[in-house]
Amino acid sequence: MRTRFAPSPTGFLHVGGARTALFCHLQARHVGGTTVLRIEDTDRERSNQALVDAILDGLHWLGLDPDEGPLFQSDHTQRHTDMALKLLEEGKAYKCYCTKQELDDMRAAQQARKEKPRYDGRCRHRSEPPSDQPYVIRFKTPLEGEVVWPDMVQGTIHIANKELDDLILLRSDGSPTYNLAVVVDDHDMEITHVIRGEDHTSNTPRQIHLFQALGWDVPSYAHIPLLHGEDGSKLSKRHGAVSVLQFREEGFLASALNNYLVRMGWSHGEKEEFTMDEMVALFDVNNVGRSAAIFNTSKLLWLNGVHIRQSGPEQLRGELMWHLQRLGVDNPNPNFIDQIIPGMQERVKTMLEMAQMAMFYFKAPTEYAETAVAKHLHADILPAYAALLEKLHTVTADEWDNGGLERAFKVVMAETGAKMGKIGQPVRIAISGSDIAPGIYDILQLVGRHESLRRLEVLLSFFQQRVHGANG
């Protein structure tokens, strides 16, 4: 089996395209086949290298690197042209000299008769073609019968040939059209299975005709349902993030996005959570449903949190480091990253949230969250906090661990009568700037004795000024 993902570099890799790439990847991997990436860049005006790079980056982040490619459609223009000329020589195509005005008049007349606008084939049997007039080359679509194919998702599809007009193969400037290029490339790249969005279904009968006219084997087709927003309309930018790399920037894991996308049209019992290995083992495009899949960002966010909680530090390290560097942390130490991850996994739903929470490990807070200050820095707890800070100064570097810190806290709580919930939150605010942070003993150890005591002293000054200022 050879599948292909064939995006056009006229926009970023969006989630709909990513799901198609994922389905191609899974179907090929499931049977030990091969995936090919073909960049369909024949629209030279709208294609550019930056968008090609963005597509490659998106696929790489998702873990969907192809076995072959990227191959560029524009590299095979001469081959596409040769095949059109071959069909012309064999009488399976013809030169059409119709002017734009003629075509416009033809469509206007058809619309006036309430007919479907289509080319009427008037140049098929033109006896005296003008010698100096520009022309296109059109395919002679069969006039009778129908095209039938067993779609792996949609079931058997029948299209009457009378619904199809004579497809342009070469434009008047000699450039090949999309459908011709796709057929030639699919044949030359030995593609056996074409998995693509159902918006391509209308191209399939035309492409099947070309395969047959050229004497080539027709691949198997699977047209998967499109992604829709929660309002039922086709997914677009107005529904929020649609670019794969934008999801990364917002803190989603590739594993979670893949997991969510595979569930857009496919299921395996009641199971919601899948690893890539599980998807490869279980996925079959024949089991993809026909109805449109609704993209629900809230559900993706929930699933992302599940993947964060179930992943080991080594699985999250690279993504957290990427986000930290974007937030201004230079070259974070991987071993230190592995130590801080477990304390945050249960508290966040995105890797961006984790990176933002982790910033205090690298940079002391320059201000404190107003809600945390108002809630926890009260005059009645100031004496206990001051006593705790004094006690922590007596804890040596060798004792600065869970056991040593816990003993110091317990002594102060016994002496002052303060509860852990009361005395602990000011410590958390001092170290992290917020009352939402990992365990107190953990953050004191990870920030280190010297820096922790410095931050605790800074908060003491702030605390005293706040209390005395309020009383004064």
From Swiss-Prot:
Look up the record and name the cofactor or cofactors this protein needs.
Answer: Zn(2+)
User: Sorted alphabetically, which Pfam families does this protein's record hold?
Assistant: Anticodon_2 (PF19269), tRNA-synt_1c (PF00749)
Compositional bias ranges of the Basic and acidic residues kind:
112-129
From which residue to which does any coiled coil extend?
A: none
Example of a GO MF term: glutamate-tRNA ligase activity
Could you list this entry's UniProt keywords, alphabetically sorted. Aminoacyl-tRNA synthetase, ATP-binding, Cytoplasm, Ligase, Metal-binding, Nucleotide-binding, Protein biosynthesis, Zinc
Which Gene3D superfamilies does this chain map to? 1.10.10.350, HUPs (3.40.50.620)
Where it sits in the cell: the answer is:
Cytoplasm
Does the keyword Hydrolase feature in the UniProt annotation?
A: no
Q: Which family does it belong to?
A: Belongs to the class-I aminoacyl-tRNA synthetase family. Glutamate--tRNA ligase type 1 subfamily.
- Biological role stated in the UniProt entry: Catalyzes the attachment of glutamate to tRNA(Glu) in a two-step reaction: glutamate is first activated by ATP to form Glu-AMP and then transferred to the acceptor end of tRNA(Glu).
Q: What is this protein called?
A: Glutamate--tRNA ligase
